[in-house]
Amino acid sequence: LSTATAPAVKKAVPPAVYVLAAGVFAMVTSEFTVAGLMPQLAEGLVTGIPQIGYLVTIFAVAMAVGGPLLTFALLKVPPKSALMTIFAIFLVGNVIAALATGYPMMVLARIISGAASQAFFGIAVSMGVQLVDERVRGRAVAVVMNGLMLGTLLGLPLAIFVGGRFGWQTAFWTISAITLGAAVLTLAFVSNPAAPAGGVEPAASTRSDLAVLREPQFLLALASSTLIIGATFSAFSFFTPILTEVTGFSVSLVPVLLLVYGAATLVGNLVVGRLADKHTISTLLFGTALNALFLTGFALFTGVPSLALAFMLGIGLVGVTMNPAMAVRIQRAGSTAPLVNTIHGSFITLGVIIGSAVGSALIPLHGLRAPVVLGIGLAVLAIAAISPALASPYLRRGAPDDASEGERESGPVPPACPS
């Protein structure tokens, strides 16, 4: 009787997972604040808009490179203690940003904050999925990723409003306060996941985590995540100039349009979170195919306001919202370990860099529609990288409902995923 009822209890996502989303909210708000306060930062730091733009790239590179290094350094630390350490590092980065009197000081602040945020994402996702039954991991990831969606939807406008009204320094002080609040909630309500039966030595665990880098299905999962996010950010990075210079919306209306886009990502994230566990690969394929379709429509009809807006909302529904399904695929092809999830996060960040950097390079040559066309190509490549996973029942659907607890929690993977 107990074995029949235990899994049902664990199907609920515990409050601790929602608390982890609060930390993600703080990190994402900080990540995008620089892009929203470029003119104020350029004036305050006595530099130009292009130099402030480089701060966005610096943050992304710090995430991609520094995040895994910081996670690796914290592997022997219990997950909750690791999160509290990261909160402290992230807080230092934002305080330095608030106190910055020149560009070099701000560069240092963004490097510290970027590395901390990526490490936090990886460990938070890892903890979130370890606190629930394997069959609802996608739902748990969606809850954690709600912090990302809400950071874009609410945190970024809040930081821009505060920074615009009271000075850009106040935006970073506000983020610091949010960080402290999230840290207190984590300290109070988040516990370390139960250790796996039999225990694993840290060195052996690290070797196992790194060994997945030789697994073809894991590498394909990394590639598809990079391409999915790259496709989305090829368009998202340039929504503002496209909507104002090509579509013809007023500059004052763009924040409202982006708010609606953010609401679409929130809805999409919730839907994908529900589908990600039982229909992992089909969700990725269908969602990415829709994204390619919406990107195509956006590229063709940017001059028609109603259609451009409709296709933009479509991109919001099926773009970054693939995160829960992407995470479930990565965990099945690899493991739920923090280092694995942080490496995955770094490849997602690589997608952001590819979409925005290559898109920027194409604009002088082919115009503002060119990055969107790039996104279409990346989405098609993503479909090609997702398709081989259809051969694995475990990657498609996970463990069967009648699998034992030991089978569900035994870790990485499936006989159907040969190396």
PLM features: residue spans?
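Helix-breaking motifs and short loop linkers at transmembrane-helix boundaries and internal kinks
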Residues: V46, P78, L99-M105, A116, ...
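Conserved MFS/SLC helix-loop-helix module at the cytosolic interface between two early adjacent transmembrane helices
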Residues: V65-P104
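Helix-to-loop junctions at the C-terminal end of transmembrane segments
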Residues: G66-P79, G268-T280, I363
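Paired small-residue
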Residues: G93-I96, P104-S113, S306-G314
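Cytoplasmic helix-loop-helix junction between adjacent transmembrane helices
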Residues: A109-M149
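Intracellular juxtamembrane helix-capping segments at the cytosolic ends
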Residues: F120-V132, V320-G334
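C-terminal transmembrane helical hairpin of 12-TM major facilitator-type secondary transporters
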Residues: S282-M326
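A late C-terminal transmembrane helix in Major Facilitator Superfamily
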Residues: R332-L368, G375
